[in-house]
Amino acid sequence: MTTKIGSAVQGFYNKTPFPDYDLSRFNSKEDLALAAYPFAKILDRSIPANASVIDVGTGTGQLSAFLSLRRDCVWGIDFSDSSLQKAKGLKEKLKLNSWNLKKVDILDSEQIDAIGMQFDYVLCMGVLHHTGDAYRAFENIMKLVKPEGHVAIGLYNSYGRLLLKKRIFLAKTIFKNNNKVKDKYIRMQIGDVEDKERARGWWNDQYLHPHETTHTVGEVMGWFTKNKIEFYHTVPSTSLFAKSAFDISGVWSKAVSPSLPVQLYKQLGWIKSTNREGGYWINFGRKKASHSSK
């Protein structure tokens, strides 16, 4: 990535690989499985063992490494040398032979094409909003999806992120040197801050990141339509009668597409209900069979 934004983001992740971890924590594949976050385990259960998977913007590789434990073809791509170096250290230590790592700038369509294959599942979790052009990056990575392949796109929501933006402002001004407030803010998102590496990584990513954009459900539904991706559902749910703020049932199951009033109603609710996640939400869909990848 040669843009000013791209250089800043790349430099940020080269200094602060994300998610950060100490390699000594992982001495076996069992350690890796035990350390997987709950939603990673949900994804693992939702993706068939014989499916090919690519994690776009894999960072230090915890998600893609975990998914490779019971699959023969899992890729992780990123453009941060430091993050990939840590991921490669994990790959070598645990002998994760089915896990392929490659440096790729997702704004560069030629680098995307050079991957040379398509995948059954394309995951891009919390990445597009840190590029200089989220839609162009999305459009590029959709070339990696097989016809009838599945996608999961995680982004910051324009409504859900509002309270975190307020905290970011306070942390950079009034409470700039207040470690108690810093700890409080981190606890709001990840709970335990005894894991200093995780806490430092989250603080840097949420409060010190050089670039982020926010997006809406309707905007992403438009992206899906333009790229012949059938919209399935979101987590948190955009179903009008969803009871849970973070509905994890039926990953890649189809739901009724929300109308504009429902989209607005649900996203206004996310201001409070996704406060802990920083307004993060995931969009699920499936590529239509008739869509050509050329």
Predicted regions mapped to residue ranges:
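Conserved alpha-helix/loop element of class I SAM-dependent methyltransferases that forms part
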Residues: 25-49
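Conserved SAM-binding loop of SAM-dependent methyltransferases across substrates and taxa
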Residues: 60-71
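Conserved SAM/SAH-binding beta-strand->alpha-helix loop
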Residues: 80
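Conserved SAM-binding strand-loop segment of SAM-dependent methyltransferases
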Residues: 95-109
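A short acidic, Gly/Pro-enriched loop at the edge of an enzyme's catalytic core
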Residues: 111-121
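A short glycine-rich, Lys/Arg-flanked "PGG" loop and its adjoining helix->strand segment in the class I
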Residues: 135-147
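Conserved class I S-adenosyl-L-methionine
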Residues: 150-187
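Rossmann-like AdoMet/SAM-dependent catalytic core
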Residues: 197-294
